[in-house]
Amino acid sequence: MAEVEAGAALELRGLPPEIPDELITLYFENHRRSGGGLLLSWQRLGCGGVLIFQDPADAKRVLAQAEHRLHGVRLSLRPAPPRAPERVLLQHLPPGTSPLSLEQHVQALLGAAGHPVQTCHALASPRQDCALVQLSTPLSEAEVSALAEQARNLPLNGATVSLAWVPQTRAVRVVDSASPVDLLLLELYLENERRSGGGPLEGLRSLPGQLGTVISFQQWQVAERVLKQKHWLQGIELSLVPHYDVLEPEALAEGVSGRDHSATQESGVIGHAPTGTGGLAGALTMAVGSGEAPQQLGTLLRAGPVGAPGQALPVDSGSIRIQGSMGSTSPVDPVESSTELPEQVGPMASDSVGVQEQEGLGEVATGQEGLMGLVGTAMESVETGLESPGYGEMQKQEGLVEMVMSVEPGAVRYLQLYYEDLLASLEDVALFPLEGTDVTGFRLCGARAPCQAAQELLQSLLGSISCHTLNMKHPGSARFLLGVEGQHLLHRLEAQFQCVFGTEHLASATLDIDPERTDPTEALQVLHGHITGIDQESLRLEDVRELLATLESPHGGEDRVPLEMEKEKPGGPGETVVEQQEEIPTLEAEEEPVALSTGARGQLEEEATLQLAIHRSLESQSQVADQQEANALRRAMALSLLEAEEALDEDTGGEAQLVVHTSFEQDVDELNQALSNALEAHLREETVSLQGRMLPPELGARLERCHDVSATLRGDRVVLRGFGVQPARAARHLAALLVDPWDQNLTFPLEASKPNLSEQGLKEPLGRLEALEENSQEFQDVVRAFYSTLDAVHGRIRIVRVERVSHPLLQQQYQLHRERLMQSCQQRPVEQVLYHGTSESAVLDICAHGFNRSFCGRNGTLYGQGVYFAKRASLSVLDRYSPPNAEGYKAVFVAQVLTGDYGQGSRGLKAPPLRVSGQVLRYDSAVDCLQQPRIFVIFHDTQALPTHLITCKNILPGTP
């Protein structure tokens, strides 16, 4: 369908199998009956299919028509997803066809159609005579048509098999699950875009006979996105495959498609309706029993003060369904699931059990006595697998339901703060706030009618709340606002402007470091000793000058006026002469000394400087060498810290964002200005003198990102502004970086966005290559390890040469990074020898600057936007990763890589994945698979050290 005009394809659902294809085409080509027009094609898929109109306007009219009926059956239509180019459907398979036979048959069809043989995979199917085959290379619509023609001519085990294209799927199916997956937990997980890549669901149902669980999404893009990721839930890896109704057994498919999608479902069926307004994701309705009368539910809202003893909420198994904000539902098959409902709906107080011992109740903010907060989320409650001891008694009761409304965290707090009395007045409904990282909102328990009325009331209240995003212009605002002082500031503004601030978006703008750890820049304070040494040099120059003046005085040292005393006298040289005249009667006797103390001062200064220079030239040269080495080490450490602590500008584009919920009447500009003024009052400044040296722009930019400060150049000084201790830390860091002058002709070592290597670019200190002798032990070790990981391509790769990569500065930074990981990392080993294939043009850059992300990572971003390394060289020698040059030579680096603790990688990552949901601590690297990782992705430039460069080439067939 890539050639089909946009909007011309419609998806047809609810089609009984007895309606022939000819009737379908005639009906939708009849302009008077259906509003349609000429059809290009009709692709039938089970109890539905895809209509492709020649004119998109015809498809638009068909959609606009209120109803379509054939043989008394109401048909459902909606825009169709585009064709899936890497997927084909095979139907009319003979019984007992194995997946291997099916894959071999598809490969035979590809060969017969003139296509190169490619890897294909037959996916698990609930129906034996239909199967879906996933291809490794996409096919065009014309190529699929040619393949379908070959399928009619080439039988499979004596049976004629039909082949057809399928659209992108809207549904996925969970198969091969080792243990049953909790359906409510699965639903919440797949609705969470951050956790699973999913989104709003259209329905969720279990197929009979352990054929799998079908999850339908409202958007096909979401389903396809979910299929591209790996999924883990409760320690179990989920196996997800595309799902179409045509793959289901005929009786089941007819039952699903034949129902009226607008009808109310029976108890025990789960489905989804479109998302409502006001930030609601829908309401979950559960028909359950209860041990108390509905009138007693209101007592939950009037429970005792904060911290009063509570009672854990047990879990019960019951019938589940999803109800939209307008009450519409979608029918699907019965399933079983679990959720929470209080065993006893009454006062939550308990004399014998304290609130600290209860797993499900917690404290709420001051002034929220009417609302009992839940610790964790609905997902956490389900994961605990609690069982209700009162289940049998509850089954005797009828008419009570439970609803879960998904609401943004800021909106929940706003309702709790400013509508407390109104919420507490709901007599017949128990209202529980859900405040967690995955699900936030309200749980309503009670009779159906009061719960629906309470739901409508909450929707109305949510409609009166406006949500705005405020951008923080000051560096370090996110870190400050998440601290104690920042929280106090936000609370004061909330009380002043009747609003609620949400800090959930601030965590991504802060550094992924532990804020409680020791300041790493304290080690750089050795610079103070260097400054003291300069002062001592100045004092020694004064001593030499005094000694020379004393030796040249005709009256000796006792009559000589010290130079310091002359400077301290208020008068000029004239006053000095008058005092000497009063003490000594003979003026002529004093004229010569006076002339010596004034006219010869410049000569005396020159002699003192010369004598000091002669003296210093006689000192040991080792002291100078030691000082230079210490300065180099100090600056190398500062550079390493600058890279290791670089701020991760992910999700917010490097700018912190604060979410605010308030009423529509509130002036948001006034609120934003008040917040900006309050932040200005907490800013601190530090000044660092450049001492006549230049500050490279790249250095200043990295320093700002590293310490969350702003650096402004004012004459010969740099003014650092930020919050808390950050300006002081940045000042220490900058002082260490300015120990020696920067060579302005060299690119900044950590900034290689525009690499510019001259002829001496591979000389020290940037890096150099040194060829290894083939008979050396080092050469043999590198070659042996390389060949042992080539796997199937072992006999097709020949090594041309091996070179050692030397880069002292990068090695120092790497060692510092390694020592830091050795102390904090739990995974062992921390360090691994990996391979990195690259192009010829990138070799010089890597040798000079290491594995910098600005010119690495161009070949793939499937597991993150970092630098990729392979555990086995067989992956690195592929032409995709190490393209050969004009002479056929390929470049593969051997590298020591600090993989540390690694997490699951995913597309779009600009930093390692978070360790724990809701915290800012991250893993050290990302991998393709947690169980057996083959690919590692790093995000710090000092995390990998190139040790050897292997130049190799492919051996052509027949080459000796």
Curated annotation (Swiss-Prot):
Q: Where is this region: Myc binding?
A: 649-856
Q: What SUPFAM superfamilies does the annotation carry?
A: ADP-ribosylation
- Which coarse location class applies to the principal site listed for this UniProt protein? cytoplasm
Q: Does the keyword Phosphoprotein apply?
A: yes
Q: Which InterPro entries match?
A: Mono-ARTD/PARP, Nucleotide-bd_a/b_plait_sf, PAR10_RRM1_2, Poly(ADP-ribose)pol_cat_dom
Q: Which GO terms describe its molecular function?
A: DNA-binding transcription factor binding; K63-linked polyubiquitin modification-dependent protein binding; NAD+ poly-ADP-ribosyltransferase activity; NAD+-protein mono-ADP-ribosyltransferase activity; NAD+-protein-aspartate ADP-ribosyltransferase activity; NAD+-protein-glutamate ADP-ribosyltransferase activity; NAD+-protein-lysine ADP-ribosyltransferase activity; nucleotidyltransferase activity
Extent of motif PIP-box: 780-787
* Catalysed reaction equations from the record: L-lysyl-[protein] + NAD(+) = N(6)-(ADP-D-ribosyl)-L-lysyl-[protein] + nicotinamide + H(+); L-aspartyl-[protein] + NAD(+) = 4-O-(ADP-D-ribosyl)-L-aspartyl-[protein] + nicotinamide; L-glutamyl-[protein] + NAD(+) = 5-O-(ADP-D-ribosyl)-L-glutamyl-[protein] + nicotinamide
Please provide the record's keywords in A-Z order.
Answer: ADP-ribosylation, Cytoplasm, DNA damage, DNA repair, Glycosyltransferase, NAD, Nucleotidyltransferase, Nucleus, Phosphoprotein, Transferase
Q: How is it modified after translation?
A: Stimulated through its phosphorylation by CDK2. Acquires CDK-dependent phosphorylation through late-G1 to S phase, and from prometaphase to cytokinesis in the nucleolar organizing regions. Phosphorylation is suppressed in growth-arrested cells. Auto-mono-ADP-ribosylated on glutamate and lysine residues.
UniProt motif (Ubiquitin-interacting) ranges: 604-621
EC? 2.4.2.-
- In this UniProt entry, the residues modified to ADP-ribosyl glutamic acid are E103, E831
Can you state the subunit structure given in the record? Answer: Interacts with MYC. Interacts with PARP14. Interacts (via-PIP box and ubiquitin-interacting motifs) with PCNA.
Q: Which family does it belong to?
A: Belongs to the ARTD/PARP family.
| Main function | ADP-ribosyltransferase that mediates mono-ADP-ribosylation of glutamate and aspartate residues on target proteins. In contrast to PARP1 and PARP2, it is not able to mediate poly-ADP-ribosylation. Catalyzes mono-ADP-ribosylation of GSK3B, leading to negatively regulate GSK3B kinase activity. Involved in translesion DNA synthesis in response to DNA damage via its interaction with PCNA.
Question: What protein is this chain from?
Answer: Protein mono-ADP-ribosyltransferase PARP10
- Give the gene name: Parp10
